[in-house]
Amino acid sequence: MSQRGLEALLRPKSIAVIGASMKPNRAGYLMMRNLLAGGFNGPVLPVTPAWKAVLGVLAWPDIASLPFTPDLAVLCTNASRNLALLEELGEKGCKTCIILSAPASQHEDLRACALRHNMRLLGPNSLGLLAPWQGLNASFSPVPIKRGKLAFISQSAAVSNTILDWAQQRKMGFSYFIALGDSLDIDVDELLDYLARDSKTSAILLYLEQLSDARRFVSAARSASRNKPILVIKSGRSPAAQRLLNTTAGMDPAWDAAIQRAGLLRVQDTHELFSAVETLSHMRPLRGDRLMIISNGAAPAALALDALWSRNGKLATLSEETCQKLRDALPEHVAISNPLDLRDDASSEHYIKTLDILLHSQDFDALMVIHSPSAAAPATESAQVLIEAVKHHPRSKYVSLLTNWCGEHSSQEARRLFSEAGLPTYRTPEGTITAFMHMVEYRRNQKQLRETPALPSNLTSNTAEAHLLLQQAIAEGATSLDTHEVQPILQAYGMNTLPTWIASDSTEAVHIAEQIGYPVALKLRSPDIPHKSEVQGVMLYLRTANEVQQAANAIFDRVKMAWPQARVHGLLVQSMANRAGAQELRVVVEHDPVFGPLIMLGEGGVEWRPEDQAVVALPPLNMNLARYLVIQGIKSKKIRARSALRPLDVAGLSQLLVQVSNLIVDCPEIQRLDIHPLLASGSEFTALDVTLDISPFEGDNESRLAVRPYPHQLEEWVELKNGERCLFRPILPEDEPQLQQFISRVTKEDLYYRYFSEINEFTHEDLANMTQIDYDREMAFVAVRRIDQTEEILGVTRAISDPDNIDAEFAVLVRSDLKGLGLGRRLMEKLITYTRDHGLQRLNGITMPNNRGMVALARKLGFNVDIQLEEGIVGLTLNLAQREES
């Protein structure tokens, strides 16, 4: 997430082209031509011993002879010279370099050289970059592109060229167009951080094939998507496609889970990609999800309606007032409804009257206008009239407008006019709906991610007990645990398992069955046979001693015949669970090579195909995220919403998924968990059969997770001056109600000191941003008083670090009636310790000169206090390294 050197890459003041040439079709010629044609307003320095000048620009024979150090260099020479040239650039002090091509054998040496000289690299095997707002075309693309608000980041040169060509035809603009290549150094997460703060960028589109660091990507994407829509197209869904791309991209459902968790939206194919570019370039942000459709034909409107229903879209309902205005304005044969079919004899005037009435209403959030080729309303004329009407209508800025001029030849000019006018336009009704639903789904994702999670009830965990059991099993050489062995581990996290006994032979199995009562189930115990069904290793509803003995002997006999080398550790004996009206589910935890542990929910079966049969989420889960997973499973028909007799307890299943998540987060020894079946009966969830694969683990537990979990280790009990003990802990998403209550106990004066303005009310979005934080990027500690089972927030302090993890902005707020207890100082001391241990160098903040308490506290804590009376602020800076030394 480092931003070091990105300014020199994306906003360079000078550029050197190493290997510039006058020979057409050479890389050095193409790069020089594009840089000069793009209108870059800084010096361009061609470096070549072969020419005195290149395209009229004085050339320099080598890097050492350059009159000054360029911000950016582009290597256009033979790849064999890359390392030597990069070394020279580093010694010259160049900050960034684009490497157009390099074999894999050079990668490590190039990375080491760049690191040694504190230089940033784009590529290798990069098409380059375009930054139209800077007049920069440092790429092979001969296509000039307009200035726009959409940034595009691609890991494929071929896709980049395709999009550039497509965008040129539609006169579509970009803020940045960056081809990453092999991402030897600069990667997508760093660019997301940069573009999130770029004023010229309002939306971001990504084409991805692989990730080098899933944790950094999810963190950066989540941060950026809170302010700007980000759409992703990810290739390599199948193993065959991954082999073709030479990537280890991981499970495709894991990508879906990560993209959704970060608040992004995934587009599925190239057709959707082009629609997404059109949408992000021209469409206004949605205010809601209600769609109004106008058409001059029933069939195109029906196609649009079918596409809308297939994606769970929402059709607007017109008010009676709007309907009456439409009846008065339109011919009698036009039925007033949504979709509104104006009929094939509709003129341009009918379109304009309808548009004017609808734009004055507030019955919808987006308006889709469909036009089929018609003699009554020629395509180009209708488009021109519509553009003028929208341009001059006072309420047009409040509605997202989408146009679909059907046909090819007759509508080509109309679509060009729409593009020039900045109105999104699409070729088909289905494509228009797809584009609309992209923005609806993005908006829904963001809304869901900001909902306040419910507090789970009776959620227990005994991490120490689970760790002890796992370590004992590992010490004994175990690599896989069965239901009997897993039972106490699951119980430590509050999960129910069916009581299980072990029988070494058929006689012992009969004895156990007699003790626990019939009917019973017998299951094979063998570490070498993962799927018991392969040898009919599960026998159910055994009702007598004779049936148990025969079933046990039959299992042993089948194993000897089919798996003579398999180790057999006896049988598991269980009472038969009451399955009447119950539903069988499956919960699996797998380890993905890119995203780490994944939690999968489905109904399973013998042939378990998670790509087709399960929904997937990244841990850690809270109640909201778990509930979304369950609902997603129901909507996608991966699980049923009810059994034959009763509905599925969504809240109960969500709580169980949270318990599974906590177990996986706390216990890195777990490599795989398979609960199958999980019996759902009313509010009871019972694991009937469980397999747990384990292995020793050393290192940072959190590093294996794509999302940093709640840092329990930072919790601390603190005694205040009045002798009261309170808990200092990181803030949680579930704290939103308590935070709102806390703010209500802070005086307006103290809030003014904190926020530099009068604040009447904090919205849910404000509070969600304060409580739903990324622990990798910021930290907020709350001081809480525990009373029975409730918590009361007494004070808050937070620090938000920059992407380079050098500086952090801090703030602290204490309940106004609790001043004088040392609460503010203790919170600040905890924050200082955390930021110093986290590797930050400086802690910065501002307050007002008349906030004497904060100024005095800062001085006591060692801050440098800079009083700026003219500005009306006091700057506070703490050098964390110096404080540690002192």
Swiss-Prot record:
Please list which residues make up the signal peptide. none
A single GO molecular function term of this UniProt record: protein-lysine-acetyltransferase activity
Please state what the protein is called: Peptidyl-lysine N-acetyltransferase PatZ
Q: What do the Gene Ontology cellular component annotations say?
A: protein-containing complex
- Per its UniProt record, what Pfam families does this chain match? Acetyltransf_1, ATP-grasp_5, CoA_binding_2, Succ_CoA_lig
EC numbers on record: 2.3.1.-
Cited Gene3D superfamilies:
3.40.630.30, ATP-grasp fold, A domain, ATP-grasp fold, B domain, NAD(P)-binding Rossmann-like Domain, Succinyl-CoA synthetase domains
Asked if the record carries the keyword Kinase, the reply is: no
Q: How does it assemble?
A: Stable tetramer in solution. Oligomerizes to an octameric form by autoacetylation.
Q: What induces it?
A: Positively regulated by cAMP-CRP. Up-regulated in the presence of non-PTS carbon sources. According to PubMed:22059728, pka is up-regulated during the stationary phase growth, while according to PubMed:22124017, it is absent from the late exponential and stationary phase cells.
UniProt's post-translational modification comment states: Autoacetylated. Deacetylated by CobB.
**Organism expressing this protein natively:** Escherichia coli (strain K12)
What is reported when this gene is inactivated?
Deletion mutant has decreased resistance to oxidative and heat stress. Mutant responds poorly to glucose.
> Which InterPro entries would you find in this protein's record?
Acyl_CoA_acyltransferase, ATP-grasp, ATP_grasp_subdomain_1, CoA-bd, GNAT_dom, NAD(P)-bd_dom_sf, Succ_CoA_lig_flav_dom, Succinyl-CoA_synth-like
Quote the function comment for this protein.
Catalyzes the acetyl-CoA-dependent acetylation of lysine residues of a large number of target proteins. Acetylates RNase R in exponential phase cells and RNase II. Required for the glucose-dependent acetylation on multiple lysines of alpha, beta and beta' RNAP subunits. Also acetylates acetyl-coenzyme A synthetase (Acs) and the chromosomal replication initiator protein DnaA, and inhibits their activity. Overexpression leads to the acetylation of a large number of additional proteins and inhibits motility.
**What's an example GO BP annotation here?**
response to heat
- Please report the stretch or stretches of sequence annotated as the ATP-grasp domain: 487-523
Q: Which reaction does it catalyse?
A: L-lysyl-[protein] + acetyl-CoA = N(6)-acetyl-L-lysyl-[protein] + CoA + H(+)
Could you tell me which residue ranges the N-acetyltransferase domain spans?
A: 726-881
UniProt lists the family membership as follows: In the N-terminal section; belongs to the acetate CoA ligase alpha subunit family.
Q: Cite the entry's keywords alphabetically.
A: Acetylation, Acyltransferase, Transferase
